[in-house]
Amino acid sequence: MSFLNIPAGRRFDLACLGRLAVDLYAQQVGSRLEDVASFAKYLGGSSANIAFGAARLGLRAAMVSRVGDEQMGRFLVETLQREGCDTTMVQVDPERLTALAILGLKDRDTFPLLFYRENCADMAIAADAIEEGFIADCRALLITGTHLSQPAVRAASTRALAHAGRHATLRVLDIDYRPVLWGLTKRGDGQTRFVPDARVTASLQEMLPQFDLLIGTEEEFAIAGGVPGDLLASLRRVREITHAAMVVKLGPLGCCLVAGAVPERLADAPTSAGERVEVLNVLGAGDAFAAGLLTGLLRGEDFASAARLANACGAIVVSRHACAPAMPTPAELAHWFGGRRGADVAADAQLAHLHRVTAPRARWDELNVMAFDHRSQFFELARAAGAPESRVPALKRLLVRAAERVEASRGLQGRMGVLVDDVYGEDALHAATGRGWWVGRPVELPGSRPLRFDGGPSLGTRLVQWPREQVVKCLVFYHPDDAVDLRLEQESRLREVWAATRDSGHELLLEIIPPRDTTDAAHADAAVLRAVQRLYTIGLKPEWWKLAPMQASGWTALAALVAARDPHCRGAVILGLNQPLDDLAKGFAAATHAIVKGFMVGRTLWAEPAREWLRGDVGDDAFIAAVATNFETLVDAWRASRPHAAASVPSPAPVHDTAQPALRPA
């Protein structure tokens, strides 16, 4: 870079020091904050948003801050870690609580904001805990303005800057002026973005010489320079104090660079035009801008390319509800710059799909799933055994224990899963959730054709109450040659499931079973493949397909279809249909293609032991042992069909798509 000296060959590209907080975003857009009924929880805080966004774009990012020793602090640390951001320097405070912000979206110009930061953890960063060796391992250090506003955090920032100066680490200030956090407004007025104040100006100017790059809006440079209403005069005052390069954010007009002397007109400075988009939420756009700008600069881009990337990141985020989770991925930016996006960002289905499937997510290279989400079958088992229906929930809790046993005996950590309903299996479902298993949960009314939803038609309302880790499983008896009215009705219901999961953030598994009365065995594979193709054609892109065993040629054809229609699909799993274990093993042997990730089998494993348990012929331990033995046999058959599957696989962890395209704007 001609205007910045950035070291190379270090462990981290960027460390961000500053606010790390929980954001609660109002879900009712257009509502007064007083009238908001529900909120969505996200990672927040300007520095944290930048670290998160930079990590998502592929930088080796790290966070320097402090959280409380409680659930919200752990949420923030885990969220950063899932994104690939280092949290070694995130201190844990045993006495203070994690910071909190509550945000509303009243209209395109009104975004009420409440900061709950009284004696919060991130304002108590211990300066002596910021290690010089850590800062020396960073190519750049970014600090946001709030952490210059109080003595304790100012001391921490000063210490980090001193370390950075000794090791030629690039020092960046995002001015991030929040008058309320400098005590200049009422505590409830977090929305006001500019209040002139000589004390703040003097405080900032004392620190400016310690930075190499300054990032700010027109108002933020006005407070830094101290000449309200005259941006050029403020920039000249800043230039008298520091040689730092200045990047001025101009909102929808883009940004400009002042690397040397301040020009007579701002238009004479190198400028990158902004993106025109419909604004939903301006909160966090500046953080997305900084993440994009620093990603470009740290990757050796010139200012024009880095600024174009920054402007795109900001434009995408202002069109979405959140800040950190709204940050784009490299795949989204490739789509953005590839000329394939629509004028309405919010309506760009492909951009939304890429955002969903290319952000880091839990990795499932293999799945060994016991399915006991059956409802009518368990009811019939109980009735045939003369047992009360009320015993079924206890039976399902025992199935979780059987799954636990097999996870341990076969080393299935990171490859274990269950399918459980919430009718008879609510307790079992709760027991399975939150332990690192793949957990699926059905929505279809058993046996319905045309498809109906169990629990009523308001699927979206139900999903709000589901843990995000649970996968929505929908079984449909579907054939592409069904009568037109039936096919269209079923496709309409499937679109509802698709739309509901896109809104809720849950993954979707579609289980496709062609009806036996219209599908002979010789054409079963073709019927399934045509069904999958048809559902792709109408716009559905589920994360998972659950299909009956096919010939090897069928799986090869499926892989080609998925690669063409949705290369980010997680893959397919084999269903059981109550087939004998030996028959399933033969099906596994034909399913060696990488598109097949595992199996989801139910009655084959537990039907006969359940019958005996419901009759009272065996006790809990014998039932668990019998089911576990069947499950182990099936796991062994799966491993025998693909020897590499027996290798140890780590627990699910976020995976970054290393095949994502480069970020360079076209």
What are these regions (language model features)?
Residues 140-237, 244, 252-261, 511-512, ...:
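Conserved beta-alpha-beta core of the PfkB/ribokinase-like small-molecule kinase fold
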Residues 140, 170-172, 213, 245-247, ...:
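Structural preference for beta-strand elements that scaffold enzyme active sites
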Residues 342-484, 582-598, 603, 607-666:
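Alpha/beta catalytic barrel-like cores
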Residues 2-86, 109, 125, 278, ...:
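Glycine-rich phosphate/adenosyl-contacting loop at the front of the ribokinase-like
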Residues 1-14, 163, 226-349:
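Conserved phosphate-binding/catalytic region of the ribokinase-like
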Residues 433-444, 490-509, 556-574, 625-640:
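Alpha-helix-loop-beta-strand connector modules within alpha/beta enzyme cores
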Residues 60-145, 334-343:
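Conserved N-terminal subdomain of the carbohydrate kinase-like
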Residues 401, 405, 457-471, 479, ...:
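Alpha/beta enzyme core
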